[in-house]
Amino acid sequence: DIFKLNEDLYSITINKNDIKDELSHKLPIAGSHLNDTIKKMLTGSITLKKIDIDLDDYSSFVFGALRALEAFIKDILFKKGIQVKNINSFVDVFFEDKRRGTFEMTTECELQINCQKTRNALVECFKYYSNQRHGLFHADSVVSMSRLIESRSEADEIINNVLNIIERSYREIL
């Protein structure tokens, strides 16, 4: 009976179509152009936003959104004739200019893309992706220094930022 009570207490009804509708609402332009796999990645994070649960770490909530942002970058690059060679890295496409504190695109990729708006959108996407994902999904060598998302509001903000960046990028590129 205790297990049934807990199941009922934490059970939440989330309709897949409602999540898809919310995604369409948040991505009015990009939504109709996004690869279906990227949409599926985003729906996981949107679904987790609906669950009312108190956690010590909400990193899992943002995983789908940041993975979708990575896929979005790779999809745009692929459409421009650039295939990311290293599955775990964008080292052939972007680099950090530590002197200026910015991320830049390699000259070879800029020439291949041949569109300043697309280049700028991709650099913005990569900057956010890099700043968020690397710290969240890789543990620090001093484990206690590893980044956690300790508040629900921070997780929601990251998810919303990813959605906004994707939408803004499509508006710029189209």
Residue ranges and their predicted role:
Residues 5-8, 18-22, 26, 37, ...:
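Charge-rich, solvent-exposed alpha-helical interaction surfaces
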Residues 24, 28, 47-50, 82, ...:
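Generic surface-pattern signal
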Residues 8-16, 20, 27, 31, ...:
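Intrinsic-disorder-associated interaction segments
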Residues 2-60:
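Charged alpha-helical initiation segments
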Residues 115-174:
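Charge-enriched, short contiguous segments at helix-coil
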Residues 46, 55-82:
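Short, hydrophobic, well-ordered secondary-structure elements
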Residues 76-123:
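Flexible secondary-structure boundary motifs
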Residues 39-43, 67, 71, 131-134:
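Generic structural signal for well-ordered, non-membrane alpha-helices
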